[in-house]
Amino acid sequence: MAEAKIEEIGCEDRISVLPEDLLVVILDLLPTKDVVATMILSKRWLSIWTMVRTLEYTDDMDDESKKSVWWFLNKSLQLHKAPVIDSLCMELGPQCPTTDDVDIGKWVAKAVDCLVMTLTIKLLWSAGPTSLPKSLYSCTSLSELTLSDQILVNVPSSAYLPSLTELELICVVYKDEDSLVSFLSSCPVLEFLFVLRKIDDNVKTFTVKVPSLLELTYKNLCSDVVDNTDRCLVVNAPAVNTCQITDYSLESFSIEDMPCLQDATIDVDEAYHPDDKFLTSFSSVLSLRMHLSDAMVMRCTTINFSRLIKLSIYPYGPDMLETLLRLLGNAPKLKEFLVDYPSLIASQKFVYNPEDLPWSWKQPSHVPECLSSQLEIFEWRDYGDRIIEEEFLTYVLANSKRLKTATISLRLNLEDPELIIEEIKDLPRVSTTSHLLFK
């Protein structure tokens, strides 16, 4: 027992004699509450924690009965002495008090003064949206910023964020459209933008005009907007190479040419009727994922996707397999093709199931070029074994001369799935080297 105690003390001594800078680096890897707790270890440890450069304060969002982290946040930041803060995260839930002495702004200002590089502020408290210090919008060191929920984005005309490369705006409220425009225009090197909108965010025309932007993710999941008149998404970002647009609000779109675009995802309300200009903006992509309504797929058949290599489609409607082949005819370089019939999508609205498919279809007289000379990978998810599905699958397998793999995932609760698999295995395949896989 005595030897074990001596060994324990020796181990403690070896840690304690490390240089303070190294101890701070080690503490930066631990949760902030554990870091502060080290002050009780010894006199030397009493102040080491005050020099850490990574701070995270997060309320338990799943248990509102727990005491808010606010008091710990407020006290520990009062004692914090590091001249530089690399990262500060403050996520306050409904249990956070909303009295006048709860001042998030002063700690944001402190982080700015300490040349913060990564800042996350998420406010789910019961109070209304709160403004942040104007100094935040002129922080020269800030490279990553996340603003979420009860935050009022009120950007001064003097805003300038010369180092900001990543920005997330999640369910915030904007003072007005000018604040949004000023915010984005103040970020000359912004490369990544993630936007999740709420219904009442004070913006009708959401303008993204960022010449440096490389990746855009825009989500508007508000399908129950009462008045969507004049609501519009405007994108002018010529350097974007990855773009995801998810919008169930039926707002309109104005998308400028994106000549560098390589990867795109389009998921809009099934009632939305796109124009040619909207879809043409995505005609140069290499990889495309689309949640297709009948109107969407018909528009796509008139657009030439000359560079498209990978296509994933998620049909809303039941009667579009014939039209899909016309779309494939406009994608001569297509090598990967995925068809997925989801029964429930992110908007929480039910869509057509495979059992709703019509019984038969009319085969085209001309085989799409991509099937005869390019397609290598084909996947069908939620295959329902209806006649039209079997005919479509038969057509693809019989005409895809360079096919390497075809993967079929059967719809749940199908009767006799083993028999269906055997029937699919018996379908003729023009590519003798192709493999059939089942999930």
Swiss-Prot record:
InterPro entries: F-box-like_dom_sf, F-box_dom, FBD, FBL13/AtMIF1-like, LRR_dom_sf, LRR_FXL15/At3g58940/PEG3-like. Residues 360-410 form the FBD domain. Residues 12-58 form the F-box domain. SUPFAM superfamilies: F-box domain (SSF81383), RNI-like (SSF52047). Transmembrane segments: none annotated. Coiled coil: none annotated. This is Putative FBD-associated F-box protein At1g05080. It comes from Arabidopsis thaliana.
